[in-house]
Regions:
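Extreme N-terminal leader/targeting segments of oxidoreductases
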Residues: 1-10, 28-33, 141, 153-180, ...
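Short hydrophobic core segments
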Residues: 11-13, 140-155, 190-192, 326-337
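Rossmann-like dinucleotide/flavin-binding elements
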Residues: 19-29, 178-226, 365-416
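Glycine-rich active-site loop/strand segments that organize a redox cofactor
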Residues: 40-97, 218-275
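Feature captures the FAD/FMN-dependent oxidoreductase FAD-binding
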Residues: 78-157, 275-278, 285, 292-318, ...
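Glycine-rich dinucleotide-binding loop and its adjacent helix/turn
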Residues: 84, 90, 94-97, 149-209, ...
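Glycine-enriched catalytic-core subsegment of oxygenase/oxidase enzymes
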Residues: 203, 302-444
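C-terminal catalytic lobe of FAD-dependent flavoproteins
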Residues: 268-269, 273-341, 435-479
Length: 479
């Protein structure tokens, strides 16, 4: 049966982190806008609802979440592989946080309606349809302004995406979510997947007493990773944070080639890799603490024969060969691609807003900034000029491509006084977090800020040459 029709200014598809960051800033910057949020999950948080039970943020809690509400407790970890660095919120904490955002801010505003366990279907001429996944009722929705697509940055997790390889009967293969439920020791543990979930699986096994000699790691691709120690809040970390930016910009400005760029970045500990003898072929914005990296490097049995094709009781079949396996092996599937590549779309697309990244590796900040632009900038061309899309990462060269757009966007933001004022007070803006506690008369730290700006300009000037060389190299022509 059809329920009563609904009306709203903005229909937001999805209630994940980027959607909530957008809505939060929209409520703050627009006095009257009404919002309808539609999501297939039973509570806000998107993929966090499906994540493994021991999942944690991979970045400091200080600049995660929505702009209006703190998530961080402002304390450092005193034990574990992240010891000495600021805390990483657990999945339970993140879900509780987003539930509080919905229940204590969005719904009490009277301007937000939330339809959980519901599915959106596109309509025409401003008419859209939402169907309850439980009750089956369908409601038409009239959208007065725009539809906001918060599903482009879909995050695939093992619990919702099964393995793409065959698993023979009698073989014990579990998704990462079920790892804490394994009730007995196994002769060996094999982690399938080299992304951040694979790293988390390795670290969990080590934390829970599995000897490194009993762990095998199927690593289809080695990755470059960001150094979490360079991304820390707190005034005591100001010099390292700003110095990190200077190091990255200087590496871009002085690099004679793309290989030279990555050599400089690694030498300055801006990018890290598991094995210094193996050249990484991917980059996905994964962040790792030095303590975690030291633990990951304890795994000696790393298999680099491509992706798994099949698991049999006594062997693993891969793209480039087969290897013997102990029949009493526990296989942990971490092969789901954490980042799903979004389509090539502008952020502002007539009557639609696509929540895509506008700063490297910062989707939540990007969503909040897009909401600010929607609230304060009327011209579509001007909106998209402020929100050029940063490509999602896949290959190492994407580190450079992401910075190219990020620096260009930043230059345009600095020309907009209103946006610049918002940026400097937004808790999702890591730069604003870094600047907390820096006094106007702190000449030493302010000089470092100016140096960062100068080197950013030098990097922006050098980027086209490096990217051109990379493109020529990809086509087989001299670089």
């Amino acid at each position: 049966m059809n329920a009563s029709p609904l009306e709203c200014d903005y229909l937001v598809i999805g209630a994940g982190a980027t959607a909530l960051a957008f809505v939060d800033t929209l409520l703050s910057e627009s006095a009257e806008a009404t919002v309808l949020i539609v999501d297939r999950h039973h509570r806000p948080g998107g993929h966090w609802n499906d994540a493994y039970p021991f999942v944690r943020l991979h970045q400091p809690s200080e600049w995660y979440g929505v702009a209006s509400r703190e998530l961080s407790h402002g304390s450092k970890d005193t034990h574990g592989f992240n010891a000495g660095l600021y805390g990483l919120a657990s999945g339970v904490e993140v879900l509780a946080y987003f539930d509080q955002v919905m229940q204590q801010r969005f719904l009490p505003s009277g301007r937000v309606r939330w339809l959980p366990m519901s599915e959106y279907a596109a309509g025409t001429n401003g008419a859209h349809r939402v169907t309850s996944l439980i009750g089956g009722d369908a409601q038409s929705v009239t959208v007065r302004k725009k539809v906001v697509n918060a599903t482009h940055a879909q995050t695939a997790v093992p619990s919702t995406h099964g393995p793409k390889y065959t698993v023979a009967d009698g073989t014990n293969c579990v998704p990462l979510n079920r790892l804490p439920q394994v009730g007995r020791p196994h002769a060996a543990c094999t982690v399938v997947g080299s992304g951040k979930t694979g790293m988390d699986a390795i670290l969990w096994l080590l934390e829970n007493g599995v000897a490194p000699s009993r762990i095998r790691w199927i690593m289809p691709r080695d990755a470059w990773m960001l150094n979490r120690a360079n991304l820390q809040p707190g005034i005591e970390n100001f010099e390292r944070n700003m110095g990190s930016a200077v190091d990255q910009f200087e590496a871009i400005a002085k690099a004679s080639s793309v290989p030279d760029l990555f050599a400089r970045l690694e030498q300055r500990e801006q990018l890290l890799r598991i094995d210094e003898a193996v050249q990484p072929t991917t980059y996905r914005c994964a962040t790792v603490a030095p303590g975690e990296l030291a633990q990951l490097r304890r795994i000696a049995d790393i298999v680099r024969l491509g992706r798994v094709r099949g698991i049999e009781p006594d062997r693993i079949v891969l793209q480039h060969g087969s290897i013997a396996a102990d029949p009493d092996t526990l296989y942990i599937d971490c092969s789901a691609s954490a980042i799903v590549m979004p389509p090539a779309l502008p952020v502002f697309d007539r009557d639609r807003i696509n929540l895509l990244m506008v700063r490297t590796c910062q989707p939540l900040f990007s969503a909040a900034l897009i909401a600010w632009v929607e609230s304060h900038v009327a011209d579509p061309a001007a909106q998209n000029a402020l929100c050029a899309v940063v490509p999602s990462p896949e290959h190492p060269i994407d580190w450079l491509r992401m910075w190219a757009v990020t620096l260009a966007n930043g230059a345009r933001w600095r020309q907009h006084a209103g946006l610049q004022a918002w940026l400097m007070q937004c808790r999702l803006n890591a730069i604003a977090v870094y600047m907390r506690g820096v006094k106007p008369d702190d000449t030493v730290r302010l000089a470092l800020v100016r140096q960062s700006g100068i080197m950013a300009g030098a990097a922006a000037a050098a980027l086209p040459t490096l990217l051109t060389a990379a493109r020529l190299n990809e086509t087989g022509q001299p670089a």
